[in-house]
From Swiss-Prot:
It comes from Xenopus laevis. Keywords: Lyase, Membrane, Metal-binding, Mitochondrion, Mitochondrion inner membrane, Ubiquinone biosynthesis, Zinc. Coiled coil: none annotated. It comes from the Eukaryota. It is found in: Mitochondrion inner membrane. It holds the Pfam family Coq4. GO terms for biological process: ubiquinone biosynthetic process. This is Ubiquinone biosynthesis protein COQ4 homolog, mitochondrial. Belongs to the COQ4 family.
Length: 283
């Protein structure tokens, strides 16, 4: 039996270097070894990639074809690491791709039924530093989507380029839907008024879980609060019901061509989408 999987070592731009070794012989996993030093504070990598794929079977540039068994292994490994460290965006990304086929099809169908969503599927816009004029966004009027999005990125020291390309979705159109969801995630933070700390991420995940039905979002919403202290849990008790109600009330957030709405005010866009006013929270 041929080797099914081998480890890939990734060093995302937002993470330091890691190393891991995975050996499969005779179709069986012989050893998984990771190296983690307390001084460096590095978490072990369990990124996998399919081997022996034919170039003719690739559906898009970053595609890595996988079978059901490989997807199961990827899902299990990435779920463990994502729960251990929710800031492992690479693990969260793999988990979303390997478990989200049903949800992605539903999202794709919602986009097809909406004029603006259909336009997005046809035009395939991308959100990255190569497609955005960040300086122009920074110079927009306060309160506009463009200005507040740029402010969010600057304050939290992130860029649109930190979103990994989709690899494990075995359908070209669904892969774009997954990529679009990933690239508008920071816009959800902006529209919901949530920072990138653990509290903010959990609140956004509750909103996205209701909106998308992606297992990865549901998992993050359910287990993310375990890492919050008592004070933040009290705030979460107010914010989660609001996020859930907003998610149910809102139109599909993938049906908005945000690149054409930079000059629209955040307040008016929130109303158009159906996001409820942010509740007051005691300090």
């Amino acid at each position: 039996m041929k080797i099914l999987l081998s480890c890939l070592r990734f060093s995302p731009v937002w993470r330091g270097p890691r190393s891991a070794a995975c050996v499969m012989q005779g179709g069986k996993l012989q050893r998984f070894q990771s190296y983690n030093t307390a001084e460096e504070g590095i978490e072990e990598d369990i990124q996998f990639a399919a081997t022996n794929q034919e170039s003719s079977s690739l559906l898009y540039p970053d595609h890595i074809p996988t079978n059901a068994v490989q997807k199961l292994l990827l899902s299990a490994g990435s779920a463990v690491m994502a729960l251990y460290d929710p800031y492992r965006h690479d693990m969260v990304a793999v988990l979303g791709e390997t478990t989200g086929a049903v949800a992605l099809r539903k999202l794709r169908d919602q986009m097809r039924r909406d004029p603006e969503g259909l336009q997005i599927l046809q035009e395939r816009p991308r959100i990255s530093t190569s497609t955005l004029d960040m300086q122009a966004l920074r110079e927009m009027q306060d309160g506009t989507l463009g200005r507040e999005y740029a402010r969010f990125l600057d304050v939290n020291r992130v860029t649109p380029d930190t979103r990994m390309p989709v690899k494990f979705v075995d359908d070209e159109e669904l892969a774009y839907v997954a990529q679009r969801y990933r690239e508008v995630h920071d816009l959800m933070h902006t529209l919901l008024g949530m920072p990138t700390n653990m509290l903010g991420e959990v609140v956004v995940k509750w909103f996205e879980a209701v909106q998308t039905g992606l297992p990865m979002c549901i998992l993050g919403a359910a287990f993310g609060p375990l890492r919050l202290n008592n004070k933040r849990m009290q705030k979460l008790g107010v914010l989660v019901p609001w996020a859930v109600q907003s998610g149910r009330n809102a139109r599909c957030v993938l049906n908005f061509h945000y690149e054409n709405r930079w000059e629209q005010s955040v307040l008016s866009l929130r109303k158009e989408i159906g996001i409820l006013p942010l509740p007051e929270i005691k300090a």
